[in-house]
Every structure is written in structure tokens, then in C-alpha cells.
Amino acid sequence: MAFDKLGRFFGIAEDDEMNEAPYTEAEQQEEEVPQAQKNERRANVVSINSGVGATSKIVLYEPRVYSDAKEVAQNLLNNKAVIINFARMDDEQARRIVDFITGTVYALNGEIQRVGDKIFLATPPKFETDGKIAELVEKKDKMD
């Protein structure tokens, strides 16, 4: 039977009639039922380890040269928050590093905030910061 079909496909066979018996409706229905059950089982697979083991880290930096900005950016790419203290740098170099880090934070959809004189906090997108240092100082002054 199969050789006849193959021969007809390539135009070699002499007999153009089909020798197979047609399927009945009962045979066709029996074949379709097991396939539907298999598809339902595949949709029920769920991973349960997705949130296990996640830790957050904050890295402290006190850069002295512009090339230290690359290390800060690498930590942001690794989903670590970074606190940067520019107290030991001149203002021009510090401004260049802040510009570089701001670009990195923008590309990652993170945030950068000034938290003090020459101190900045840069966070990747999974971190959430609340409040401002200036607001906290004002509240403390009102309480005193």
C-alpha cells in the first residue's frame, strides 16, 4: 500500500485507484480524544523556584578617578544599589562620573538621588526608595 502511494506520488505506479478503505467516523473520533488530553496536561506546568534565593546588596564607593565609574556601572548592571561619596574628588571629575552613572541608570530604568553633599544613591529598577533626606532633616528639626 505505501509503495503504491509513493509510486503514484512520483508518477511511477500504474494503478491510479486507492486501495485503502476509508475511515469511519468512529475511528476518527477515537484518535482525536487522546490528543486533547495531552494538550491539557502541558499547560499545567508551573515553576515554583522563581522567587527563592533573591538577595539585595548595596555597594559603597568613594571614587578617586574617572575610571572608577565603570565599576559603579557594573554593580548597577548586576542589580546592586550603589552609594557614591565624592568627598575626595574635585567637582569637575565628580560631575563627569555623575553624568556617566545617570546614563547607566536611565538605560536600566533605575533611579539616582542626591542624598547629601557630594553623596548620591543609584539604584537598579528592582529597588524602591521612599522619602528624601531633606524631608527627614526638616522633620527632625521640627521635633527638636
Curated annotation (Swiss-Prot):
InterPro entries: Cell_div_SepF, Cell_div_SepF/SepF-rel, SepF-like_sf. GO terms for biological process: division septum assembly; FtsZ-dependent cytokinesis. It comes from the Bacteria. It is found in: Cytoplasm. The keyword Mitochondrion does not apply. Gene3D superfamilies: SepF-like protein. Keywords: Cell cycle, Cell division, Cytoplasm, Septation. Its main location: cytoplasm. Homodimer. Interacts with FtsZ. This is Cell division protein SepF.
